[in-house]
Swiss-Prot record:
Residues 1-42 form the signal peptide. InterPro entries: LPXTG_anchor, M_anchor, SMCR, SMDRR, YSIRK_signal_dom. Sequence repeats lie at residues 69-75, 76-82, 83-89, 90-96, 97-103. Residues 54-133, 170-340 form a coiled coil. Residues 385-415 form a propeptide. Pfam families: Gram_pos_anchor, YSIRK_signal. Residues 69-103 are annotated as: 5 X 7 AA approximate tandem repeats of [KMNR]-L-[TQ]-[TDA]-[ENQ]-N-[NDK]. Residues 87-100, 108-125, 158-189, 260-277 have a biased composition (Basic and acidic residues). Keywords: Cell wall, Coiled coil, Peptidoglycan-anchor, Phagocytosis, Repeat, Secreted, Signal, Virulence. This is M protein, serotype 6. Residues 280-343 are annotated as: Hydrophilic. Its main location: secreted. The lineage of its organism: Bacteria, Bacillati, Bacillota, Bacilli, Lactobacillales. The gene is emm6. One of its GO terms (biological process) is phagocytosis.
Amino acid sequence: MAKNNTNRHYSLRKLKKGTASVAVALSVIGAGLVVNTNEVSARVFPRGTVENPDKARELLNKYDVENSMLQANNDKLTTENKNLTDQNKELKAEENRLTTENKGLTKKLSEAEEEAANKEQESKETIGTLKKILDETVKDKIAREQKSKQDIGALKQELAKKDEGNKVSEASRKGLRRDLDASREAKKQVEKDLANLTAELDKVKEEKQISDASRKGLRRDLDASREAKKQVEKDLANLTAELDKVKEEKQISDASRQGLRRDLDASREAKKQVEKALEEANSKLAALEKLNKELEESKKLTEKEKAELQAKLEAEAKALKEQLAKQAEELAKLRAGKASDSQTPDAKPGNKVVPGKGQAPQAGTKPNQNKAPMKETKRQLPSTGETANPFFTAAALTVMATAGVAAVVKRKEEN
């Protein structure tokens, strides 16, 4: 009966396996448990206590509560131990990071100390040079003072010998005073010259640094200009060859179509476009010449203004290169169109157009059937099939713009 009652109130799942077995065995045979944080001890109850199931249950419940509290305490300590372990890992990682950062800072400090030592050495050398100049100046001044003293001594001796002549003596005293004043003025002048030499030395050093930087920049600009000139000359040669070929093809095309009115209109329109392109090219050439003058005047400008002017010139050169590429592409398209047009017969048999005469409509056809094709041919060149904007406008503009760039680059290189 007592065994059945005690089994209903056991709550030993949270105890260790050995502790639970001992507790169950002791409770069955009539023993009590005393549970501490680190150990489980057993003591034998008197016979009367074992025979009292209520008291045994009360003790077991009490031990169960204490065991639960200890288990909760143990879980809490385990969690805190885990947190402390994680914090320890983080602190170690932070320590490693700080150690690495300390090494980097130590290296930077060493480099800074080395740079400071180099600067200090340069300063010492400069001070040594100035000190040498100062010593030479002081020696010169001392020599002059010695000479002045010797002159004064000689004058004094001469004055002692000529005491009888008061006028001569007075004149000698005045001359001595003048020499003394001149000596003092010479001393002041020497000190002033020394200060001026020191200032000029500093100024010369600064100008030398600026001159070195400017010379390097001008050398880079000259090299870039030479490369740009070579590229422009190469592009100009290619475009000139293309232009000659296109001109030859145009002459052939014009010779075969001199009697057509629409070619004359297209030629007039092309002339207007060429004149307009010539004006644009002249304006661009004037702008390039202005930029060249600004480049020549940039020798007196600051480094910042030189950089801005160089960027402007590079942007202009880039725009011209893009224009050259675009126009070369247009020339290629025109050549392809001309080649396809040369393979097409000029007119169908029976529909040959006589220059200066209109074509009568065929029998059985309406007169307005050919209006749309005629309107279309007026908007196109017969040789290439392109629109009324003549194909040689782009070529002329390319040649003139390229020639202007080449002239500017040549002037820049000569300057």
